[in-house]
A protein has these predicted regions:
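AMP-forming adenylation/ATP pyrophosphatase catalytic core
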Residues: 81-84, 192-199, 204-413
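Active-site- and interface-proximal helix/loop "cap" or "latch" segments in soluble metabolic
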Residues: 7-70
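Disulfide-bonded cysteine-rich modules in secreted/extracellular proteins
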Residues: 4-8, 73-80, 284
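Strand-helix-loop interaction patch of compact alpha/beta domains
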Residues: 1-10, 294
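ATP-dependent adenylation/nucleotidyltransferase module used to activate substrates
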Residues: 71-223, 243-244, 250
Length: 413
């Protein structure tokens, strides 16, 4: 037998749960504030027991340390964010679903941390959505791991003069690795999420594809997922629109139907990335703004506060519009010039081609239009020869390749 303890505190109040386990069954429990006794329940059954918020938090913290369940072919683990999309994904997963929410690190100085998909408030909303349907829910506290795997590279990238995309790094490796590992411990046959994307078969391979709703399509953010994992993943919202999702949530009476959308880069908590970087050690050292010929054009307060293609806020007067062409971390300079100097026709990326293609459409921003290109595989990824010049491309961005709406490759510029 083993003993596990979970606690939770808020506004000076504290709750404590102590469980004695024999295998995956609770033989004794000291847990006030829950709606039913825990003794005699399996860990899976205990995860479905609701209660007062602090008590439910404390129970979740205890269960997360040891959670496991006997495999069940119909069981689906559903990644829950507390929002409407994951709540409707839970509906699609049926009566054998189990919800799981990742509690991730959020900047404690963020102006609006409640907007984040991984905040304590989001965790509570996700748990209550599951418990309202009599379904189990588990919270995984991965704040330290997330900060090392996603936040630290984001800070290092900007300090080195790159424009990193933390959401692609998170979804392409960290988040889904943790969720799939949990699904296995929970005895679930697959993992469902509320992302708007599809999985298709092509030439004997499972590949990611754009969602039916072009406005909500999230295949770009998911593009670095290893296709070998797609056999264990399900995107139940991929064939429907956001309006259909909200209508479904309202018909089911889900509280999440009224929850506001969370922003990207959740750890920023609604704040500006420049303020975040200053708070977390990226020095704002003054330097020169120069033109392509090296002539002085002005001063900046930190090169990393400028993005390739940026036009506004340069603080430089000119008879013609000037754009940021590049930044140089070593020299601490920002280079500006006319828009035509932004044009690039060849792009190289570190990454992989999931299938062999000679041509594809490439996106290097979530909202950027796709540009046709010839594709050449290289030792470390691929090189793209664009049919038309691209503007505002910068190191650190993600390049995602599509062929007829299917993701056929992804990498980092």
């Amino acid at each position: 037998m083993i003993e596990v303890v979970g606690d939770s505190s808020r506004n000076g109040e504290v709750a404590l749960v102590r469980l004695t386990l024999d295998g995956d069954r609770i033989v004794d429990a000291d847990a006030d504030g829950l709606e039913r006794p825990l003794a005699g329940l399996s860990l899976l059954e205990a995860a479905a027991v609701p209660g007062e918020k602090l008590a439910a938090d404390a129970l979740a913290n205890a269960l997360a340390q040891v959670f496991r369940a006997t495999p069940e072919p119909n069981r689906v683990a559903v990644a829950m964010s507390g929002g409407v999309d994951s709540a409707v994904a839970l509906l699609h997963a049926g009566r054998d679903a189990i919800g799981v929410t990742l509690r991730l690190w959020i900047d404690p100085a963020a102006p609006d941390s409640e907007r984040a998909c991984c905040s304590p408030e989001a965790v509570i909303a996700a748990r209550e959505t599951c418990h309202a349907r009599g379904l189990p829910h588990v919270t995984l506290d991965l704040r330290d791991e997330f900060r090392r795997a996603v936040v630290a590279p984001f800070i290092r990238g900007y300090a080195a003069g790159e424009t990193p995309n933390p959401c692609i790094r998170c979804n392409g490796s960290f988040r889904f690795a943790e969720l799939l590992a949990f699904a296995e411990r929970a005895g679930a046959s697959r993992l469902a999420t509320g992302h708007y994307a599809r999985i298709v078969e092509r030439d004997g391979f499972r590949l990611l594809a754009r969602a039916r709703d072009p406005v909500k399509d999230q295949s770009y953010m998911l593009a670095r997922l290893d296709p070998r994992l797609l056999g264990r993943i399900w995107f139940p919202l991929g064939e429907q629109t956001k309006d259909e999702t909200r209508a479904e949530a309202e018909r089911a009476g889900l509280a999440a139907s009224r929850r506001a959308e969370s922003q990207e880069a959740c750890f920023l908590g609604g704040g500006d990335y420049r303020d975040f970087l200053r708070r977390h050690g990226v020095a704002a050292e003054p330097g020169e703004i120069i033109d392509e010929d090296g002539r002085h054009r002005g001063k900046h307060a930190g090169f990393w506060g400028f993005t390739t293609g940026q036009r506004r806020g340069l603080g430089v007067s000119s008879h013609q519009p000037l754009y940021v062409l590049s930044t140089d971390a070593q020299a601490n300079t920002v280079v500006v010039g006319p828009r035509e100097s932004l044009a690039v026709e060849t792009i190289s990326a570190r990454g992989r081609l999931y299938v062999q293609v000679d041509r594809a459409e490439v996106k290097w921003r979530y909202r950027s239009p796709a540009v046709p290109a010839a594709v050449v595989q290289t030792e470390r990824g691929f090189r793209l020869h664009l049919d038309a010049p691209a503007y505002g491309v910068s190191p650190g961005q993600a390049a995602v390749l599509y062929d007829d709406g299917v993701v056929v490759g992804a990498g980092v510029l």
